[in-house]
Amino acid sequence: MQHELLNGVIPIIPTPFLENEEIDEAALRNLVDFACGCGIKAACLPAYASEFYKLTDEEKLKVVKIAVDQAAGRIKIMAQSNHPSLKSAIALAQANVENGADIVSLAVPRIFTLPEDSLMEYLSGFLSAIPETPVLIQDFNPGGATISPSFIKKLHETNRNFKYLKLEEPLCAPKFEEILKITEGSIGLFEGWGGLYMLELLPLGIAGVMPGLGVADILQKVYEHRINGSNEKAFSIFERVMPQIFFSLQNMELFHYAEKELLAARGVLKNSIARKAAYIPDHSSKKYISELNERLVALAQEI
């Protein structure tokens, strides 16, 4: 299959909600329009940062359909099709492809520990079900091991539509280097976790990062400066955005609040509603997030 690998920033579009916690379609269309104006090539939903685990399967398909329709080819839409059941994940993926998604993404099932043979069977079954569609495999396993470089190589050799890999773990440079070496750069490697390690990893040859949408345009500038050798500019911008990313990622549910508050501060969203169970920040956290977000709004206007 012919596919030009993506690079740069691929942000996660959050799921906006009304007061009754139903999906806010108009707000989602605003988010897609904002993404299309960030200088990026693609955006992803519904992922962890979209609260996918609080959506019904019908809602997961709905947000992708809306995004594809609103993007109208301006950027590519990566449709996350997560489900711990292979049968259900395949059904989601095939429906997303039918609905116009350009790329499909799948998270390694991590509810319970599984041996690599089980994960190989699961991922291979998924990839073979949509052989003509590029797929990103995400492994988000806080505090635990992620799939090994040898596993990644074997999966890629037997499934050529396995085009992208997203890993989210600290001190990952040696592992990223090994993956790039043994796959000969044939997999587009992306760092998650808000892009927190991007300045270290970009010189190693990773394709890009997958942060929240609220900082997508800012981190795209960081990406461009870093790969073009404008390191002082890259660091000067990144040093100003890092406190917000670091603070918000202390807790995934706190991230939803901080991300939606940032998008509201930037005039894209009208509220920061997350579906319950949701993190209820204390007064100090609310105040500090507001301060951090104000600084990012000013930074976005400067650059």
Task: State where each predicted segment sits.
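Single-residue recognition of alpha-helix capping/boundary positions
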Residues: A27, E59, F151, S284-S285
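Active-site beta->alpha loop and helix N-cap motifs at the rims of alpha/beta catalytic domains
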Residues: Q2-A145, L263
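A general structural signal for well-ordered alpha-helical segments in protein cores
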Residues: L28, K60, V64, A89, ...
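Short, solvent-exposed alpha-helical surface patches in well-structured domains
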Residues: N30, K62, K154, K233-I237, ...
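Catalytic alpha/beta core domains of metabolic enzymes, predominantly
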Residues: L127-P131, F140-M252
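Secondary-structure boundary/capping signal
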Residues: I75-K76, P134-V135, K163, I187, ...
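C-terminal alpha-helical cap/extension of soluble enzyme domains
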Residues: I10-P14, C38-G39, Y197, P203-I206, ...
